[in-house]
Curated annotation (Swiss-Prot):
Protein origin, superkingdom: Bacteria
The entry's keywords: Aminoacyl-tRNA synthetase, ATP-binding, Cytoplasm, Ligase, Nucleotide-binding, Protein biosynthesis
Lineage: Bacteria, Pseudomonadati, Pseudomonadota, Betaproteobacteria, Burkholderiales
Stretches assigned to coiled coil: none
Residue ranges annotated as motif 'KMSKS' region: 651-655
Top EC group: ligase
Motif ('HIGH' region): 42-52
Membrane-spanning residues: none
Protein localization: Cytoplasm
Provenance organism: Verminephrobacter eiseniae (strain EF01-2)
GO MF annotations in UniProt: aminoacyl-tRNA deacylase activity; ATP binding; leucine-tRNA ligase activity
Gene Ontology annotations of biological process type: leucyl-tRNA aminoacylation
Record GO cellular component, one term: cytosol
Family according to the record: Belongs to the class-I aminoacyl-tRNA synthetase family.
Protein name per its UniProtKB record: Leucine--tRNA ligase
Length: 907
């Protein structure tokens, strides 16, 4: 056994041993309970970050713990390998994205292996492999055949820098999620998936408690994104005719509202820039035409429109109020989306905050029609009660006056239905998923374009449509347009004439919508999913239905995008008879972000320059609060001592120079320290604030563990010296008489084991580590018994240390593996890989004696030890005979016993 804890040597040896044993290859086993635990697959950006380390260590701890408890556990890994970053790196470095991606995968895989993760690498996949994306294409064709996939022209979000379409979810405050460029609106053809057909079911599963293992926060985010609204769709009649003489829209401008009770407060209508009425008015209005062009920049999402300045322009057109026949002016508003509802909204300035601001800006009448008792309406400023539908009562609304919200909505709906101008309707915020991307590095959409037959699906026998690997994008659009090899020899499947391939590729969220199923049978070239998927993804107690994977782990940032698409994809596969589950993930854990200090200073260009924490010294006030920082060495043009700004804690990122390189951490302290620190510092769901001093503390703890094992080894106290049961509890034909210290040690160890086991089941891994630390403290503090019972001491120590090693093994597997073997536990009960989880010994928890506080006249004067089952009379006798009682020099008048707590002698 090594005299010194050397993590690099220990970890290398342990990993070599696991590799030689092929320790983590998993197959189906009908004799064991199965458990499928999976982390969200990473994008191969080049290097792991500490968020990866935390995510995968959580998964690894769960996997190892369950394996020790007799489960057949699958922990796979793959690569979300398509996407824009690879293209941009190719532009920067002048190399094909395929090469850049493969090199990154190779390096990041080495990093994962250095962490000692229990990954079954035989199931590794990369979404850029033709053998994987063939099935993207195959399922796309099935969706096309079933009408789930379709092609249409629509106004989309266009990123002018990346020159691609963005899904609504990829637009943040009117800017592209990756480039930050102001998003434009364009009309282009593309393929869409009817996720809206599944809206009701997608909503039901997150609102009807059918996903009890999901965080409530995530379910609420999905509920809000799906956005079911029940309201009224009705029309404002008009007589505006187009160039052909026909009434535009049949002479009706339709809107949808959930606030029909405010219909008498409508003072204008607004339409989207793409609305037919706007287009008609712009033909004779150059200013309006210019405004419509201006509206084409900016996002097409509700979030984007909510943050941008609200602008509008009169069209000169009018519609008629359906109840009062009052003429209402039509405006073009940059905040109205053509893709939502009918591309028009009714303007009720008095009771809608957006309309209120718009009316103030353009001098439009504000007409109050709802009153809340005790409130005063001020036409100059918005107050939250203006939109209160719970307390409000209608006023200034003719026959509808005096009605509460629901009553007024029903009454208005009835009248408009009678007039043939309205109907009750349910609408959804969710929109069909646009999957076409005008980029190269993605799954080719399996469509051929023929001059005669249009868009024709590629025959299944010709799949996969393979993406050329030799393209080097130059940033000026999709290189597939001009790639001769991609189009060479392509003919129409219908007529056989020369044709061209579709050059759009699929949104990369398609790749990640089902990869977890492919892990179950990754090498199958005959089917998308097969028997292995049924084994790993389904509860064997359920014939059909239910949820799939047992545990999914990933960041909260994927709550809407990835998770919603994966749920949709699973339901489509179910309806096509490919899987038997309703949902992809039974339980979901969203781990917290890893945070670090952020230091910056504004540069001469007006931007901010960020500094690495190791180059900075913090400045504190008298209370110890960080109030600033200064450089401890020259950085670029900034000399040592320069004052810089402290921005607080924030997510680790390359752009802010506050990341920690896992490889450097492993090189200095070892993988076990990195794993231990990320688990101990905070609960898995909470943010982890990085602290270099705490890393040192984690490393010191592991040195203590090693040194204690070294002491046992030197004293000859190895597991081979005692007969151990498989669970780690002592088991001999004639159990030795444990001395009091040994009994106390065993009681404390088994109490801690009970708590640690409970925390493992709850996945509260920070308290698992703290429990293990308490175990080590108990072992280190153990004092030998009297000579007559010293024979039992080695057994208590070796049992206790064996329990500690097994409690530590899921979080720090390398050091536990090494000590387990060096101290003979492997020879006694088998290799730690498959050693059983230690069981709590109920006998060890039984206390022979208990300690009671001793009071004299209500004041604490010490304690006494009494038999655990002592009667009150026996306790009184022991208390009266205690040194403190005898020192009083008198006979107590009364003895008060509080069972299990204290004895009070009253003199």
């Amino acid at each position: 056994m090594q005299d010194k804890y050397s993590p690099q040597d220990i970890e290398r040896a342990a990993q070599d041993d696991w590799r030689a044993r092929d320790a983590y290859r998993v197959t189906q086993d009908a004799g064991k309970k199965k458990f499928y635990a999976c982390s969200m697959l990473p994008y191969p950006s080049g290097k792991l970050h500490m968020g990866h380390v935390r995510n995968y260590t959580i998964n690894d701890m769960l996997t190892r713990y369950l394996r020790m408890n007799g489960y057949n556990v699958l922990m796979p890994m793959g690569w979300d390998a398509f996407g824009l970053p690879a293209e941009n790196a190719a532009i920067k470095n002048g190399m094909p994205p395929a090469r850049w991606t493969r090199e990154n995968i190779a390096y990041m895989k080495q990093q994962m292996q250095a962490l000692g993760l229990a990954i079954d690498w035989s199931r590794e996949l990369a979404t850029c492999d033709p053998g994987y994306y063939k099935w993207n294409q195959w399922l796309f064709l099935k969706m096309l055949d079933k009408g789930i996939a379709y092609r249409k022209t629509q106004v989309v979000n266009w990123d002018p820098v990346d020159q691609t379409v963005l899904a609504n979810e990829q637009v943040n405050e009117g800017k592209g999620w990756r480039t930050g460029a102001v998003v434009e609106k364009r009309e282009i053809p593309g393929y869409y998936l009817k996720i809206t057909d599944y809206a009701e079911e997608l909503l039901a599963f997150v609102t009807d408690d059918r996903l009890p293992g999901w965080p409530e926060r995530v379910k609420l985010m999905q509920e809000n994104w799906i956005g079911k609204s029940e309201g009224l769709r009705f029309a404002f009649p008009h007589d505006v005719r187009g160039d052909d003489g026909a009434l535009i829209g049949g002479g009706r401008l339709y809107v949808f509202t959930t606030r029909a009770d405010t219909i008498m407060g409508v003072t204008f209508c607004a339409v989207a820039p793409e609305h037919p009425l706007a287009s008609h008015a712009a033909k004779s209005n150059p200013a309006l035409a210019a405004f419509i062009d201006e509206c084409r920049s900016g996002g097409t999402t509700e979030a984007a429109l909510a943050t941008q300045e609200k602008k509008g322009l009169r069209t000169g057109l009018y519609v008629t109020h359906p109840l009062t026949d009052e003429p209402l002016e039509v405006w073009v508003g940059n905040y109205v989306l053509m893709g939502y509802g009918d591309g028009a909204v009714m303007g009720v300035p008095a009771h809608d905050e957006r309309d209120f601001a718009f009316a103030l800006k353009y001098g439009i009448e504000i007409r109050q029609v709802v009153l809340v008792d005790g409130e005063h309406f001020d036409y100059r400023r918005w107050q939250d009660w203006y939109g209160d539908k719970q307390r409000g009562v209608t006023i200034n609304s003719d026959s509808f006056s005096g009605l509460h919200h629901k009553e007024a909505v029903q009454a208005v709906a009835h009248v408009l239905e009678q007039k043939g101008l309205g109907e009750k309707k349910t609408t959804w915020r969710l929109r069909d998923w646009g999957v076409s991307r005008q980029r190269y590095w993605g799954t080719p959409i399996p469509i051929i374009h023929c001059d005669q037959h249009g868009a024709v699906p590629v025959p299944e026998k010709d799949l996969p449509v393979v993406l050329p690997q030799d393209c080097i994008p130059d940033g000026t659009g999709n290189p597939l347009h001009s790639h001769q090899g991609f189009h060479a020899g392509v003919t129409c499947p219908v007529c056989g004439k020369s044709a061209r391939r579709e050059t759009d590729t699929m949104d990369t969220f398609v790749d990640s919508a089902w990869y977890f199923m492919r892990y179950c049978d990754p090498k199958n070239d005959q089917a998308m999913v097969a028997e292995g998927t049924d084994y790993w993804m389904r509860d064997p107690q359920q014939a059909t239905g239910g949820s799939g994977m047992d545990q999914y782990i990933g960041g909260i940032e994927h709550a809407i995008l990835h998770l919603l698409y994966a749920r949709f994809w699973t339901k489509v596969m179910r309806d096509l008879g490919l899987v038997k589950v309703d949902e992809p993930f039974n339980r979901l854990l969203t781990q917290g972000m890893v945070l670090n200090h952020i230091y910056s200073r504004r540069n001469d260009n007006g931007g901010r320059e960020y500094f690495w924490p190791q180059d900075v010294e913090q400045v504190h006030d008298a209370a110890g609060k960080i109030i600033g920082a200064r450089l401890i060495r020259a950085v670029g043009d900034w000399p040592a001592g320069s004052a810089i700004d402290y921005e607080g804690m924030g997510t680790m990122s390359k752009s802010r120079n506050n990341g920690v390189d896992p490889q450097e951490l492993i090189g200095k302290y070892g993988a076990d320290t990195a794993r231990l620190h990320t688990m101990f510092t905070a609960p898995p769901e909470a943010a982890l604030e990085w602290n270099d001093a705490a890393v040192e503390g984690s490393h010191r703890f592991l040195r203590r563990v090693w040194n204690f094992g070294l002491q046992l080894h030197a004293a000859g106290m190895t597991a081979a010296s005692a007969s151990l049961a498989g669970a780690g509890a002592p088991q001999t034909r004639n159990p030795p008489a444990f001395g009091k210290p040994a009994k106390a040690l065993r009681r404390e160890i088994h109490q801690l084991l009970r708590q640690v086991d409970y925390d493992y089941q709850r996945m509260q891994y920070n308290t698992v580590v703290s429990g293990a630390m308490k175990m080590l403290n108990a072992l280190e503090n153990f004092k030998a018994s009297d000579p007559a019972s010293q024979a039992s001491d080695p057994l208590a120590l070796t049992e206790g240390f064996g329990i500690l090693l097994r409690c530590l093994y899921p979080v720090t597997p390398h050091i536990a593996h090494s000590l387990w073997r060096d101290l003979g536990y492997a020879a006694a009960v088998g290799e730690l890989l498959d050693a059983p989880w230690p069981q709590v010994d109920g006998q060890a928890l039984v206390q022979d004696e208990i300690e009671l506080m001793l009071q004299i006249n209500g004041k604490l004067r010490g304690s006494i030890l009494v038999p655990a089952q002592a009667s009150q009379a026996a306790i009184e006798r022991i208390a009266r005979a205690s040194p403190a009682a005898l020192a009083a020099g008198a006979v107590p008048k009364r003895v008060i016993v509080v069972p299990g707590r204290l004895v009070n002698l009253v003199f």
